[in-house]
Structures are given as C-alpha cells and as structure tokens.
C-alpha cells in the first residue's frame, strides 16, 4: 500500500473558503471514479496560525496506481479547474506502508 500526502497553501481570494470546500468535496468523490484510488481523506485547516490550507491523504495499492490516479482525467479536471486557479503551493510525500 502506498500513502500519498499533499499539503496545499493557496493564494487569498474573495471566495477562497467556498473554493476550498468545493475542492474537498470533489476530491472525496474520486475513489468512486478511479478504481485504483482505494481511499482518500481531505481536511481543511481550521487553525489560521498554520501555514497550510488543505491536506490530502490518499491510498493506492501499488506505485503505478499513484500515476494512474494522478493522471486520471477526473483528477486532472480538479487540478486544472479548481486547484491551479488558486495558485497552490503544494508539499508532497509518498511512501510505502
């Protein structure tokens, strides 16, 4: 099993909170669309003193499944339409568990 963790810091915008909730909702639907994605947890930071706005924790069975998930059209649509416009500054780590 591979664990994929991403932390996002987004630029400020008038509708940032609504956009973060939309990103969370859409990411949480991906296991129903991408069979290789076994589980996903998305959290919105509630502590304004912290740097990161959103965290993602995803689980796939094999390393190649991580590529399948990352390149899947449903995932890419979220990245292109929701994450990229907010100019995300991500930090990522992947490891076998």
Predicted regions and their residues:
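Short S/T/G/P-rich N-terminal loop/turn motif that feeds into the first structured element of a domain
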Residues: 1-53, 61-71, 94-97
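An amphipathic, aromatic/His-enriched active-site/gating alpha helix that lines ligand/cofactor pockets
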Residues: 59, 63-92
